[in-house]
Amino acid sequence: MPRSLLTFATILLAGALAAQATHFTATLTGAQEVPPSGSTTLGQMSMILDTGNSTLAYRVVVGKFATAPTAAHFHRAAAGVNGPVVIAITGGPSIYSGITRALTAAELADLRAGLWYVNVHTSQFPGGEIRGQISAATLPVTYGAGCMGSNAKIPAISGRDFPSPSNAVFQVGLTNAKESSIAVLLMGVSKTQYGALVLPFDLSIIGMPTCKALCDDIGIGGSTATDANGAAFMPVLIPFQPALVGITLYSQWYVVDPVANLLGLTNSNGLEAKIQ
């Protein structure tokens, strides 16, 4: 396909996905206020649309302000422009969370078009101290392949929602694993290198035929037990550190399965999830 057509197709696909978005994110800074407030306080928002009733479940976490917060809202306007309040949000002074009223079709269209922002007002900056333009979040995707266990199934990884400094935890799930066994979640920041190893790395050399290592590990995963159906999940803490935004996490499950192969382990496919 010619480069120009490929670029055009990519733009169309991105627009189509945004028009159907159900998960949203924003990073709040003083620089996004109009005019800029000069505040160094940061904030992060995550939000999920309930498509059944058109409500939004939101969570906004902010740092410490010099003066007390007085209000927080969702507004309608493009980046760089001030706009009217659409919905007032509840909570504070550090965490705002709740569920909105049902959105109208026009409000939902504006949200998906990037025409909403969230801001927090303080007594020092009554017009707004920090602001974040809301955009569709990038949801986790799987990659690679796992290897079959003694139950004739291949363990599968999944991610619930997306990792964000505004959320307490990011849930990583496992299905199709050996039942009532031990599962270990590796989580790192690379899918191409694990120390001196180039990934994906063929694990047949250590007795795991058809299995591959798909990510590195920085020690933020852990171990758990699978249930009678071979399922499990791991809550992974994402601390409120806005500097983490933009980092991509890579994960893979390893499951104890003594008769599956010589080493007695199987593993899942990989999960790629961007902190946002």
Language model region names:
Residues M1-S4:
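Positively charged n-region of N-terminal signal peptides that target proteins for export
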Residues T7-A16:
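Bacterial N-terminal signal peptides
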Residues A9, A57, L108, P155-A156:
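N-terminal hydrophobic alpha-helix used for membrane targeting or insertion
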Residues A9, T122, M148-A152:
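Generic hydrophobic/packing signal
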Residues T10, T25, T55, I182, ...:
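A residue-level signal for beta-strand positions that form part of recognition/binding surfaces
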Residues A16-L17, T266:
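Hydrophobic alpha-helical segments
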Residues A18-A72, R76-L139, V255, I275-Q276:
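Metal-centered catalytic cores of metalloenzymes
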Residues I48-G52, S135-Q276:
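N-proximal, solvent-exposed segments at the start of the mature chain
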